[in-house]
């Protein structure tokens, strides 16, 4: 639904930015006052605004992929251009309305040009720096205690990854980097908390190469996954979706990909490791997937297991945490939030989720939310880091 409202907002923002830009360019050089030059700039600027929408309408292929990548980066530019130019215009307005309104400083052409250059440098630094930051994966360690016997295990080393968003932004290089970090942790088990794909199987540039990377994961007791809200086949624009009356499900090739890569998909079901520790995989609440209309409640899912043994729940989004804790779940692992992904959303994420990021105790149950390996929309992270989470679980 958000995608339907994105275009008018996009156009309004860029109209304001364009007015500011042309005013600034006219101060730079007289060539930017010529109609032909202005027309060329307007045409290029208009293309970038419409790029994401055009890409959503054309068939899958190299052209569509290139346009989607351009659109994603342009969306990131839009976010920071709107912020920086908006702040610059607000400061100028305050000065104009203040006692400095007649000051040469406020009216100076040189100051206006320097102000514009500063805005461009800041926007560029945020976009370029944010992109570089988004490509550098880190490992975050957690220590968790569960007051139950672990049976065969005194400790269990769990690596949690989520939000890979394999597709337009994330490809073989990032997945190889992820696999290397996973193997460095020497895990007992690897859990993938959904949003493995980015709404389209075709968006991956090298599915076979990515699959081979997954096969290199070294885990003593296997790799398990759940689906997230992006693990379905649907049209997206800048990470936002269109409404549909039809039930949205994963592309069958996504299911086959996991199977061939050696990843076990958990669909409202559990596995037990060495008859000692349960791992239960919950479907996504809004998009539970093929063959599931309504997922099990916390009480229902716990009733399928022996709660004398440790129960770890893996799901995409950190929801119903209090209910899960009350039902007897010992550890909850999830993703989805991206820790806000980029400034300023990283500051507001805490108002949107029960646990926006990291380790949070919900009654006696630890909840761990990872910021994710990949991202949706613009390939930019400012104020957050892409990560894998290395969770050291200690039993009684």
Name the predicted role of every residue range:
Residues 148-396:
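Soluble catalytic domains of enzymes that build or remodel membrane lipids, polysaccharides, and related
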Residues 29, 99-100, 138, 262, ...:
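Glycine-centered secondary-structure boundary/capping sites
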Residues 65-69, 144, 159, 180:
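Short amphipathic alpha-helical coupling elements at transmembrane boundaries
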Residues 113, 123-150, 168-173:
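Hydrophobic alpha-helical transmembrane segments in integral membrane proteins
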């Amino acid at each position: 639904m958000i995608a339907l409202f994105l275009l008018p907002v996009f156009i309004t923002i860029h109209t304001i930015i364009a007015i500011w830009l042309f005013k600034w360019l006219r101060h730079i050089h007289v060539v930017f006052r010529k109609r032909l030059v202005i027309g060329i700039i307007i045409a290029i600027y208009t293309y970038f605004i419409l790029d994401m929408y055009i890409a959503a309408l054309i068939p899958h292929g190299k052209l569509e992929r290139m346009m989607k990548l351009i659109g994603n980066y342009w969306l990131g530019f839009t976010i920071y251009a709107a912020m920086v130019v908006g702040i610059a215009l607000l400061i100028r307005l305050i000065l104009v309305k203040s006692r400095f309104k007649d000051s040469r400083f406020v009216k100076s052409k040189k100051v206006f040009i320097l102000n514009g250059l500063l805005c461009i440098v800041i926007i560029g630094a945020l976009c370029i720096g944010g992109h570089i930051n988004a490509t550098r994966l880190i490992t975050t360690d957690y220590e968790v205690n569960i007051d139950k016997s672990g049976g065969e295990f005194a400790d269990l080393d769990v690596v949690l990854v989520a939000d890979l968003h394999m597709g337009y932004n994330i490809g073989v290089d990032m997945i190889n980097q992820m696999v290397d970090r996973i193997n460095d942790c020497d895990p007992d088990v690897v859990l993938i908390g959904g949003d493995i794909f980015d709404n389209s199987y075709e968006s991956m540039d090298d599915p076979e190469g990515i699959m081979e990377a997954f096969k290199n994961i070294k885990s003593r007791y296997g790799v398990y996954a759940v689906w997230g809200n992006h693990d379905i086949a649907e049209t997206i624009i800048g990470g936002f979706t269109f409404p549909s009356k039809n039930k949205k499900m994963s592309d069958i090739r996504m299911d086959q990909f996991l199977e061939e890569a050696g990843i076990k998909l958990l669909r409202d079901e559990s596995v037990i490791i060495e008859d000692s520790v349960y791992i239960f995989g919950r479907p996504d609440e809004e998009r539970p997937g093929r063959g599931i209309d309504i997922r099990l409640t916390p009480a229902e899912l716990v009733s399928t297991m022996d709660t004398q043994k440790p129960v770890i729940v893996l799901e995409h989004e950190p929801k119903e945490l209090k209910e899960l804790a009350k039902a007897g779940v010992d550890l909850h692992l999830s993703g989805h939030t991206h820790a806000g992904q980029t400034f300023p959303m990283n500051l507001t994420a805490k108002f949107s989720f029960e646990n926006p990021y990291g380790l949070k105790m919900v009654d006696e149950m630890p909840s761990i939310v990872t910021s994710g390996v990949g991202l949706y929309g613009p390939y930019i992270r400012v104020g957050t880091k892409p990560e894998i989470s290395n969770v050291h679980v200690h039993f009684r």
